[in-house]
């Protein structure tokens, strides 16, 4: 195991249990809090100016470092807006891609090597135009130049990118909530937990169906999200199999692999659908698949996420099947609320 992964696991253990390292790192957490507060106050007081786009902006992000399930929420937000007559475009950092000075703008079947894993998946799932660049205002400007019909921008991540003014903030968390409630590196938080009181909605990736919380006046809208597998699609040729077919296979001949922020969540989703692979392979997030990690897997069929499937295609392994999922929300009125909120906040 490489050094960065070992350090990450050590930190995560300290976040859960405490210990000598947490005590040692407390001064750094205090420094994190100071830097975050100064940056936010600079924008709130006008000392630093945020750039405002000529169209509404929805930011989907988190305060918990690591994978909480933002990408499915971004996809669902785009689809909900499309269903209500909006023409959304998406901006993203393009993690792991050397974009260069100018933003990269595309649409449709984008390559992960050119745009990043999440942007490629979002573009394929929604058909929305997408621009990638670390500087969010620059990405929005390029997106609107290339696609002037876009009338709302959805920012994939970017809650902490305050240089881009936003009209709606949606935070995605999982059942870990705010963890131990401490800032990096003593805890998992990029911003203080109190930041959640300022956002418009909090979506909890519950992993299973859950009822929506009753809206409270003046508080963020609270709802749950979970992923529901629909079918599997072979990576090499697009052939499909039903969930019942997969569940009927002998577990000993079935494997599952995931190179996402929280691989265990993917394996749990399969189990809830009655699919119990005997072999599971947890890979690092944004795994490149430059070489096949499946060579030693003794399985007739290997299930992967849709995000992994984009990069697995080059492996030309007929055992690989991408599990397609639908995003379910506990709040049936979320899309109407989001659309109405955006229209109310338009100048």
Curated annotation (Swiss-Prot):
One of its GO terms (molecular function) is tetraacyldisaccharide 4'-kinase activity. Its EC number is 2.7.1.130. ATP binds at residues 64-71. Keywords: ATP-binding, Kinase, Lipid A biosynthesis, Lipid biosynthesis, Lipid metabolism, Nucleotide-binding, Transferase. Pfam families: LpxK (PF02606). GO terms for cellular component: plasma membrane. Pathway: Glycolipid biosynthesis; lipid IV(A) biosynthesis; lipid IV(A) from (3R)-3-hydroxytetradecanoyl-[acyl-carrier-protein] and UDP-N-acetyl-alpha-D-glucosamine: step 6/6. This is Tetraacyldisaccharide 4'-kinase. It comes from Bordetella pertussis (strain Tohama I / ATCC BAA-589 / NCTC 13251). The gene is lpxK.
